[in-house]
From Swiss-Prot:
This is Putative RNA-guided DNA endonuclease Rv2885c. An RNA-guided dsDNA endonuclease. When guided by an RNA derived from the right-end element of its insertion sequence element (IS), cleaves DNA downstream of the transposon-associated motif (TAM). Cleaves supercoiled and linear DNA in a staggered manner 15-21 bases from the TAM yielding 5'-overhangs. Binds reRNA, an approximately 150 nucleotide base sRNA derived from the 3' end of its own gene, the right end (RE) of the insertion sequence (IS) plus sequence downstream of the IS. One of its GO terms (cellular component) is plasma membrane. Zn(2+) binds at residues 372, 375, 389, 392. It comes from Mycobacterium tuberculosis (strain ATCC 25618 / H37Rv). In the N-terminal section; belongs to the transposase 2 family. Residues 415-460 are annotated as: Disordered. The active site is at residues 224, 313, 399. GO terms for biological process: DNA recombination; transposition. One of its GO terms (molecular function) is metal ion binding. The keyword Ribonucleoprotein does not apply. Its EC number is 3.1.21.-.
């Protein structure tokens, strides 16, 4: 796996996104780089699968997969792999070496994610064997980490290896003035296709100011996110400070999306009108995403700059989207997706570090909505927006009550164990009956279960 960047004390990694305005020649060159990355990724997946197959067949072992090892193998075969089928011309010199390195690194990371998941060391969703990337299905993107890449001093252009200097729609002064002052250094520039546009994300190492930038360092607030409101902010004294309305960008664009989707369904796939409708559909989806992203960034930045301690819920957003069979479940899932409930916590997790505030994530099972903030009585309230407490007869608004309870949330005492120890997949579960040898013993590969996680990889 690729080595992680060690961020020095007082520094952090930030990304600045700009929309590119390339010429036709530059757009064609970027498209070639997208394809070159896919080619290198697919070749790496093929090589890794061949190594696994050889190990399973006769026990042939290979070196531990890494970017360095596989890049050397790629350099020995690229003259045979990157050949135009019609002209027989070798085309790999037309693209920067960074495109091929990015594809190989992506495949290596995907391989180790799969192996870590099989070994039970990776949290999150189950990850399978790396799959091949296909044009039209895979997101077009390429990352440049070395070479002639920079933000031009004129604040209107970015320079990329091989491709050259590309004009941007937005002014790049946000990052250029940091670089000019010596407070930032460019680490990588990633170009990706976003609908009908090309976006460049400039990842930089930024030196943060040492002084606290929080307006109210002693303020302690709870933030409840939801569908009715984007966020409700309250303090521990029971005062609701802010009620942020939900822009509902998907609901606003749903009528147009349906109209364009129906029009495209009546077109012949691959025709001119079909491509026009697809472009229009992409623009609408991009608009929805941009509106949602803008409101979430404005909200989370304001919270991180204003309050010293912010408490949010540890929601299982993915689990909430799996609700099926209930009345109105489809519309509810769409509304939950439109609200992006997990995004504010993700934004606050790094923005609080930037501005000197702190973030506390409440326990997933903390009953913030159904606990009366006056008498602490807990009762089932269903989906009701307003409810009356059976203990003290006070009527509560669901979101306001949850925000107040979150502001009063106290972190439980830490368990005995090594500091920073992560809970691995299944480590917090009780053991139960199962087949001898565990999950790997059920795989009929003809090899002992203990040898399976490595799949022919010799760890040196």
């Amino acid at each position: 796996m690729m080595a992680r960047l060690k961020v020095p004390e007082g520094w952090c990694v930030q990304a600045f996104r700009f929309t590119l305005n390339p010429t036709q020649t530059q757009a064609a060159s970027l498209a070639r780089h997208f394809g070159a990355r896919r080619k290198a990724f697919n070749w790496t997946v093929t090589a890794l699968k061949a190594d696994i197959k050889a190990w399973r067949a006769d026990g042939t072992e290979s070196a531990k997969p890494s970017l360095r090892v596989l890049r050397k193998r790629w350099n020995t075969v690229k003259d045979q792999v990157c050949v135009n089928a019609q002209t027989g011309q070798v085309w790999w010199p037309e693209c920067s070496k960074e495109a091929y390195a990015d594809g190989i690194a992506g495949a290596v990371d995907a391989y180790w994610n799969w192996q870590s998941c099989r070994a039970g060391k990776r949290a999150g969703k189950t990850v399978g064997v790396p799959r091949f990337k296909k044009k039209g299905r895979d997101a077009d993107r390429v990352c440049f980490t070395t070479g002639a890449m920079r933000v031009e001093p004129d604040r209107r252009h970015l320079t990329l290896p091989v491709i050259g200097t590309i004009r941007t729609y937005e002014n790049t002064r946000r990052v250029e003035r940091l670089i000019a002052k010596g407070r930032a250094r460019v680490l990588a520039i990633t170009v990706r296709r976003n609908g009908t546009r090309l976006d460049a994300s400039v990842r930089v190492l930024v030196q943060r100011p040492q002084q606290r930038r929080v307006a109210l360092p002693d303020s302690r607030v709870g933030v409840d996110v939801g569908v009715r409101r984007l966020a409700t902010v309250a303090d521990a004294e029971g005062t609701v400070l802010e009620q942020v309305p939900n822009p509902r960008p998907l609901d606003a664009a749903l009528r147009g999306l349906r109209r364009v989707s129906r029009a495209r369904s009546r077109c012949t796939k691959g025709s001119r009108r079909y491509c026009e409708r697809t472009t229009e559909l992409s623009r609408l989806h991009r608009r929805v995403n941009d509106v949602r992203t803008h409101h979430l960034h404005v909200l989370t930045t304001r919270l991180a700059k204003t309050h010293g301690r912010i408490v949010v819920e540890g929601l299982d957003a993915a689990g909430m989207l799996r609700q099926k069979g209930l009345p109105g479940a489809r519309a509810r899932r769409r509304a939950l997706s439109d609200a992006a409930l997990a995004t504010p916590r993700r934004h606050l997790s790094y923005k609080t570090g930037w501005y000197g505030s702190s973030l506390v994530v409440a326990d997933r099972w903390f009953p913030s909505s159904k606990t009366c903030h006056a008498c602490r009585h807990v009762q089932d309230i269903g989906w009701d927006e307003k409810w009356q407490c059976d203990g003290c007869s006070i009527t509560h608004q669901r979101d306001d009550n949850a925000a107040i309870n979150l502001a009063r949330y106290e972190e439980p005492p830490s368990v005995v164990g090594p500091v920073g120890a992560a809970v691995k997949r299944g480590a917090d579960r009780k053991t139960g009956p199962g087949p001898a040898g565990g999950r790997e013993a059920r795989k009929a590969t003809g090899h002992p279960a203990g040898e399976q996680p490595r799949d022919g990889v010799q760890v040196k």
